[in-house]
Amino acid sequence: MKGLYQAAGRTLVTLGGLSIFSGAIAFFPVFSCKLWYTGWSVWIACPIWNGALAVTAGSLVLLAHREWTQRHLWEAVFTFVILSILGCPLHFTVALQSALLGPYCFYSFSGVAGTNYLGYVVTFPFPYTKFPSVCVDPLHYEEYHLTLQVLDLCLSLILFCVSLAVFIKLSARLMQTGYINGPENPQ
């Protein structure tokens, strides 16, 4: 049991950090520092908030494991793991929808006053292989977009599984003993 909580906590912190990073780099397409590419949408916000929940839950798991008898820490872990479980399907759905709709191309087809969002122009799902350079600026934005969405799909699935494992373990302990904090941690 000692290894499960440590592994789950470290996994939640690491993958939550990757999710926050994924949402943060989505602000700047293809690492462009042009301010007019900066955007804010649910595609960006969802990985950041879900990652923040996972990092918080993982940090609390690691802290609660060290201070085994602190009941308030285990209750906070339980709460944030539930929130993470609820956020992961939303994160997965947004990433899947975003991958199927295609990239939000800036200044495409007709210069500065371009079509902007190509999801209304091309077929559904987005034909990544048929139009290799639909987004004129920034270059390689289709590959960048698809890579970020696949990363978000994988992260949300793994975060869901790890959060669910911690939730099941804590629920089993709650049903067995009647309280959420376990016996003294031998160190």
Curated annotation (Swiss-Prot):
Sequence intervals crossing the membrane: 11-31, 42-62, 76-96, 106-126, 148-168
> Keywords for this entry?
Membrane, Transmembrane, Transmembrane helix
Q: How does it sit in the membrane?
A: Multi-pass membrane protein
- Give the domain of life: Eukaryota
**What is one cellular component GO term in this UniProt entry?**
membrane
Localization of this protein: Membrane
What's the protein called, per UniProt?
A: Transmembrane protein 212
This chain is encoded by the gene named Tmem212
